[in-house]
Amino acid sequence: MDVKKLIVVAIEKKVLDLTGKQIEIRLDEPPSINMGDYSTNIAFRLSKELKKAPKIIAEEITSSLSIPGIEKIESLNGYINFFMDYSVFSKETTLEINSKQENFGKSDLKNKKVILEHTSANPNGPFHIGHGRNMVIGDSLKRILNAAGYTVETQYYVNDMGRQEAIVVFGNDRFKLDKSKKSDHAIGQTYVEANKLLNENEELEQEILNLMKNYEEAMENGIENEITEKFKNAVEYALTGFKETLSTLNIHHDKFVWESEFVRSGLVRNVINRLMETGKVTEEDVYRLDLSEFGIEKKLVLARLNGTSLYSTRDVAYHMTKMENCDFAVNLLGADHKLTGIMVNKTLALLGYNEAEIVFYEFISLPEGSMSTRQGRFISMDELFEEAKLRAREEVKKREVAKTEEEIEEIAKKIAVGAVRYNIVRISPEKPMVFRWDEALDFEKVGCPVIQYAHARCSRILENCEPSGLVNSKNLFEYEMAENEKIIVKLISKLPEIVEKSAEVRKPQILANYALELAQGFNKFYGNCRILKEENETVRNSRIMIVNSTKLVLENSLDLLGIEMPGKM
């Protein structure tokens, strides 16, 4: 039962009768359910137009107003407060959740395809924690958009044509790959060694330029040769390691799109030619595109004078292909790429294409001394995860919840994935964040373990009863419910609304914060309401239904954030 929607529809009709206009109704939630479950200030908004006091308007709206699922409607000093009939609402909510199971929270198909690009790190070394923020937010958005009814295709844009990849190929020709290392780490080591060699011998720079030029020419002419093979092997070797890291964090891309595809297909050349014809390109040290009509002072670097393309041009070609194959596109980009992302979008507009939506995220860092790094320069996502798992193992052993080494490992891995993913996704992307272990692995207040532990608590309760036999009970919730019962039922009912809102505004942190609020609400319910030891059978069965429903909603919420439940903690 969508009580909120029923309230809005009923008030809209009353307002239409009073004003002859369709006016958007906004509902607020009072700080305590004792003051009402929902309220509206619509009477204040209409006061000037109707030339009446808000109190009088509120009374006119509420007179003879009846809404299914609402037990009491109160007009108080111009505000209209709605009190739900919790006996009806609780029964319908818990039965719906138990009926829909893993589908509770999901919406009908919207018949819109989304291409969501995330991660897209250069294949020249392992993912660092900055990439981690991109991949976690991106994958969470994919899951949420899917649940909201969109058809989502996730893409990883592989930069196989830039200077950085040419340096990797150059390095592979001179240094032996350390096959004892994970492949992306081995590539990273070669990249560092090659850069050092280039810094010490400036005359070798021409070799990098030649590699880039020869690779692009081969791609443009559809030629497979020794150079193309070297680039392909280097990139694929790095991607093998990338995919391992992504899989560890429950992240999988639908498609890996190579940058060179657009050179090979001729689309990049087509983009350059079309932009040259706009009359907005100037020949300087390179060809530059004037975007001043969009309020951008800096010019987009289009191509080198020798005709070879640049990353920005290939990016435009990639986005043209995206836009031709979806209803809208979403990109995850670091804040340091803000100008570049906007410039690519305006170039698309110049060519008659829709712009991509961009979710920008700020930097992520670790407190100094929180963990050591064997890389010396940055913390890789692999190191971050291993450290999380090590700390989680210690906690699992301390709590004595697992008997075998395999069980300890399985629980620790799920806690570690949850700690890393949740601690990243709960913070708004536009805010810089510091990854703190005391928050990530917090079992008491803000960490994912709080949510996982609430779920484990639900599981333990349900092990001692049979909730499946309760769904047909006719007298569920037919008693005076406690405040903590009402609060938790209201919370579990909100998942569909939360998913819809998170998808609409592209903010997975809304769902993350909801999951924590739900876990905290359940803990209060558990601490204040007897469940299995409750003597009244109706009350006991109703509370078991709340436990089972909460367990399902917690599972569904964390699943949309790419996090699994350990089962016991």
Swiss-Prot record:
Motif ('HIGH' region): 121-131
Family the UniProt entry places it in: Belongs to the class-I aminoacyl-tRNA synthetase family.
A Pfam short name: Arg_tRNA_synt_N
Coiled-coil ranges from the UniProt annotation: none
GO CC term (a single one): cytoplasm
Entry's localization field: Cytoplasm
Predominant localisation class: cytoplasm
Entry keyword Cytoplasm: yes
Protein name per UniProt: Arginine--tRNA ligase
Entries under CDD domains matching the protein: ArgRS_core
Listed GO MF terms: arginine-tRNA ligase activity; ATP binding
NCBIfam families: argS
GO BP annotation list: arginyl-tRNA aminoacylation
Reactions the enzyme catalyzes: tRNA(Arg) + L-arginine + ATP = L-arginyl-tRNA(Arg) + AMP + diphosphate
EC number(s) recorded for this UniProt protein: 6.1.1.19
